[in-house]
């Protein structure tokens, strides 16, 4: 830029600088020049960053400009993945934020699943308002999900995309493989020999109901278009008893889920698992039983996630710190990591929320906690205490200004 003094025209130049819309023709001719808008923006003194994605959901307001913040975390041109992590201390508003996000996703027609280990009843009114399905998983609950269910899947889209080249796998064998995880949860020190015995008992149980490794055997000849009736844990228990001493330990532990305090898990499924909004409430489960509830919920959700890659879906997990402790922390953590890393390939987003960051990062020196944060492109950081704020600021490389805002 070449500066030219306004000799004998100082008054006119001063008036031009004021917001009076008074332009002096002579000075204007001397000063005008062509400029790119990017260059022009650099001399504009009022600058603020805005986040307004097309087809996004409302997240809040920009504190600096009061403009609305809308984010479309499914926009692959802007975000590497659609995952979201919400961190904050007790009372910072994590659950409220998560609930609002889920309701707005549901309003846009996106499939919503949520696993709530604590205070699941806070979601009940929102679920009922949206016509969703609220499922309380606990001993004595009126809501039942059969662990041995082999559910019908809608493979229409997969057939259209992949045709006959789609990999076909025995549904029975896949379910047996999943139920092996259930046995590892109820019997932490189960041996490989006992797992093989349980595998044999499962095959015999399904065979009693006419179900073999052939997927066509799932269809009920007496009820066209429907699957055969599915066995229950009680039927599996009978097969374990028949096997004898080799299955004694497994049968003894399973008996609690057949006619003991947890016998509600030995009932046919009686909830609508095809709803567009499904909330699993695990609040009434003890620390010992919570891994079983997580297994039941994730077993169903993971099947539905992989059903259709073209359909957007959201899987939310509140109070993740409660999932990463106890005897099943390793199994739960690995399942969480599988969802975080692979859900993008199935058109989905994983939303995780947690307080008590010491517990969140405690297991295996924070391996799972750090991986969950790094695997989420969008992060909500709410009020934290000093120590937690320092840790998060260091982990996420926050500026001092950002770090100051998250301190309570």
Predicted segments with their positions:
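Conserved ASCE P-loop ATPase motor domains encompassing nucleic-acid-directed helicases/translocases
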Residues: 1-13, 17
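Conserved P-loop NTPase motor cores
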Residues: 4, 67, 74-92, 96-104, ...
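P-loop NTPase motor domains
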Residues: 13-69, 119-120, 124-132, 137-141, ...
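Amphipathic alpha-helical segments of the small helical/lid subdomains adjacent to P-loop NTPase cores
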Residues: 198, 404-407
């Amino acid at each position: 830029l070449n500066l030219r003094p306004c000799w004998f025209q100082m008054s006119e130049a001063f008036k031009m600088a004021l917001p009076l819309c008074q332009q002096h023709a002579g000075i204007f001719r001397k000063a005008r020049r062509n400029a790119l808008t990017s260059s022009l923006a650099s001399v504009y003194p009022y600058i603020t960053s805005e986040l307004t994605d097309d087809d996004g959901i409302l997240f809040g307001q920009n504190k600096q400009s009061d403009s609305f913040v809308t984010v479309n975390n499914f926009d692959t041109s802007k975000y590497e993945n659609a995952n979201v992590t919400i961190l904050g201390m007790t009372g910072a508003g994590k659950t409220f934020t998560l609930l609002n996000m889920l309701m707005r996703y549901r309003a846009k027609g996106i499939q919503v699943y949520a696993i709530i280990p604590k205070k699941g009843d806070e979601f009940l009114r929102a679920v009922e308002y949206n016509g969703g399905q609220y499922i309380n998983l606990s001993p004595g609950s009126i809501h039942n999900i059969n662990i041995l269910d082999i559910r019908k899947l809608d493979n229409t889209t997969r057939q259209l995309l992949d045709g006959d080249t789609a990999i076909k796998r025995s549904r029975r064998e896949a379910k047996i493989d999943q139920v092996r995880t259930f046995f590892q949860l109820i019997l932490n020190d189960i041996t490989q020999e006992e797992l093989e015995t349980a595998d044999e008992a499962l095959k015999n149980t399904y065979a009693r109901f006419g179900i073999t490794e052939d997927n066509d055997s799932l269809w009920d000849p007496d009820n066209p278009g429907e699957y055969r009736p599915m066995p229950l844990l009680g039927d599996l228990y009978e097969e374990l008893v028949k096997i004898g001493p080799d299955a004694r330990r497994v049968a003894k532990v399973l008996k609690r889920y057949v006619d003991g305090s947890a016998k509600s898990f030995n009932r046919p499924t009686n909830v609508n698992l095809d709803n567009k909004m499904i909330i699993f409430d695990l609040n009434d489960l003890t620390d010992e039983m919570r891994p079983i509830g997580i297994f039941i919920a994730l077993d169903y959700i993971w099947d539905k996630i992989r059903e259709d890659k073209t359909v957007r879906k959201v899987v939310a997990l509140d109070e993740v710190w409660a999932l990463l402790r106890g005897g099943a922390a390793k199994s739960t953590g690995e399942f969480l990591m599988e969802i975080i890393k692979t859900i993008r390939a199935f058109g989905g987003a994983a939303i995780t929320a947690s307080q008590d960051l010491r517990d969140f990062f405690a297991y295996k020196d924070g391996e799972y906690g750090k991986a969950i944060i790094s695997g989420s492109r969008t992060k909500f950081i709410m009020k934290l205490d000093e120590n937690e704020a320092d840790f998060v600021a260091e982990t996420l490389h926050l500026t001092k200004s950002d770090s100051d805002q998250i301190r309570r």
